[in-house]
Amino acid sequence: MIKVMVMKIAVIGGTGDQGLGLALRFAVAGEEVIIGSRDAEKASKAASKVLEIAGRDDISVEGATNPDAAASADVVVLTVPLQAQMVTLASIRDQVRDKVLIDATVPIDSCIGGSAVRYIDLWEGSAAERAARFLREQGTRVAAAFNNISASALLEVSEPVDCDCLVASDHRDALEVAAELAEKIDGVRAIECGGLENARIIEKITPLLINLNIRNRVRNAGIRITNLPEQE
């Protein structure tokens, strides 16, 4: 089993469905969560929504601006659409110095007005690699994770999430932190996939899952990797 860590987690872009779902799952798992947004009031409303969905008052979740959330956190999870990725990273660049940042960005065509089932090839290879390149001088260790987990499944907090979480990073500590966070979500198993270049493959799975949702009229298509040894 992965060692248990207690973390203060900033979910940047946490007012969208993916970010809200991750914030919800981390909070009910006992973590201290800060939802980040460009608008502090919007972030506070999202935090209140997490409390409402959870139906509990014993969880720790609050809202803040993106820079304030990132500054206060031990680990930062980025959950913004592709078109907002770089401007958001620029706004928190100083606040993520020497921290682990987990990027859940997926480059899909719907981010620029096209199809949600079409992947956009990026010059850097993947959205996570683009983030790592941008933050390299800050000493930020970037991991790719949560790209393939359905937002609607995350928000159905009474049900386990039937999906593995594929994790990639060039830094051992970032891999471990991302895997630890993933396995705080009921039903999720973290699969360490190696270096960050593997994010190119991980990110491309998401438009396929969206296509399967559409074709089969479901919402929560996920991925499971079989016949692997138990990870210690």
From Swiss-Prot:
Its EC number is 1.5.1.40. Keywords: NADP, Oxidoreductase. Optimum temperature is 60 degrees Celsius. Is extremely thermostable. No detectable activity is lost when the enzyme is incubated at 65 degrees Celsius for 4 hours. It catalyses: reduced coenzyme F420-(gamma-L-Glu)(n) + NADP(+) = oxidized coenzyme F420-(gamma-L-Glu)(n) + NADPH + 2 H(+). One of its GO terms (biological process) is copper ion import. GO terms for molecular function: 8-hydroxy-5-deazaflavin:NADPH oxidoreductase activity; coenzyme F420 binding; cupric reductase (NADH) activity; ferric-chelate reductase (NADPH) activity; NADP binding; oxidoreductase activity, acting on NAD(P)H. NADP(+) binds at residues 15-18, 37-38, 42, 80, 106, 151. The keyword Oxidoreductase applies. Optimum pH is 8.0. One of its GO terms (cellular component) is plasma membrane. Belongs to the F420-dependent NADP reductase family. Homotetramer. Catalyzes the reduction of NADP(+) with F420H(2) via hydride transfer, and likely the reverse reaction, i.e. the reduction of F420 with NADPH. Probably functions in the regeneration of NADPH required in biosynthetic reactions. Is specific for reduced F420 as electron donor for the reduction of NADP; neither reduced FAD nor FMN can act as electron donor. The enzyme is also specific for NADP; NAD is not utilized as substrate. This is F420-dependent NADP reductase. It comes from Methanothermobacter thermautotrophicus (strain ATCC 29096 / DSM 1053 / JCM 10044 / NBRC 100330 / Delta H). The gene is fno.
